[in-house]
Design a protein with these regions (language model features):
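Catalytic phosphate/nucleotide-handling subdomain of diverse soluble enzymes
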Residues: 54, 58-119
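Accessory "access/gating" subregions that flank catalytic or transport cores
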Residues: 1-80
Length: 119
């Protein structure tokens, strides 16, 4: 299974001339410009509430600054605010991008409902 090496950059390249995605592309570029900044600072700057675009921007920053599921989700939770929607997005992204095996087994084992379909 070979997917895209960098889905975020692929999205930007594929949709750069589509007006429908103009606002999304602007936000992605804003987040990419903040890649070297601490995650909690970026979340505070972009918005800690569940509303768009802050939740999208915070989740995207965790994605582009993390190498794996665990580090991205932990970073998202530690940033505070309404982190549930961000953590859901980040977890779904990494599970889809890196595969189900990217989810830490110890997390799965501690979550009763997940045992029935992930182990």
């Amino acid at each position: 299974d070979k997917g895209l090496k960098n889905p975020v950059d692929a999205f930007l390249k594929q949709n750069k001339n589509k007006s429908y995605f103009k606002r999304v592309i602007v936000k992605i570029k804003e987040v990419k410009a903040l890649k070297k900044k601490p995650h909690n600072m970026v979340v505070k700057k972009m918005g800690m509430a569940c509303s768009y675009p802050g939740t999208f921007c915070g989740a995207l920053h965790a994605i582009i600054t993390s190498k794996n599921y665990k580090s991205a989700v932990l970073k998202t939770i530690k940033a505070g605010g309404c982190n549930c929607s961000r953590a859901n997005f980040v977890g779904a992204y990494f599970a889809a991008f890196k595969g189900i095996k990217s989810i830490p087994k110890e997390w799965i084992q501690k979550t009763e409902a997940s045992k029935s379909f992930l182990l």
